[in-house]
Amino acid sequence: TGYENLNNYPTPILFPGTITENLINYYSNKNNFKLGVIQPTSDQIEKEEIKWKKREIKAEVHATSPYTNINNNREWETISKSLKSFDPDLIYLNCMGMKSEHKSFIQKKLNKTVLLATHVTGSVINDLL
């Protein structure tokens, strides 16, 4: 649901990763669903692959920094080519530092649905207010 251990906090806390992961689980209700993931650092790739494998979702996970100019960072171009070959049903930008420009870049390259962690979390917060 996005709430974690509510008994431990005097005020409910929303966890962006949990919110987005539950949304992806719901969205992935078809056979052979494939997920593309972009993380901010390579040391997170293995953990992310394991997480989706446990959920029986085939995922291709990449890493690149959202804090560089997307037009001058060849990694974004390389990742988009790899994801195009993988042909995911959905792409998840799993970093609160990734922005609309990253989402637009990937959408234009792949013509696929892209979930941006900040947008998903913001939508939930907006609906709760």
Where are these regions (language model features)?
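Non-catalytic structural scaffold of enzyme domains
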Residues: 1-129
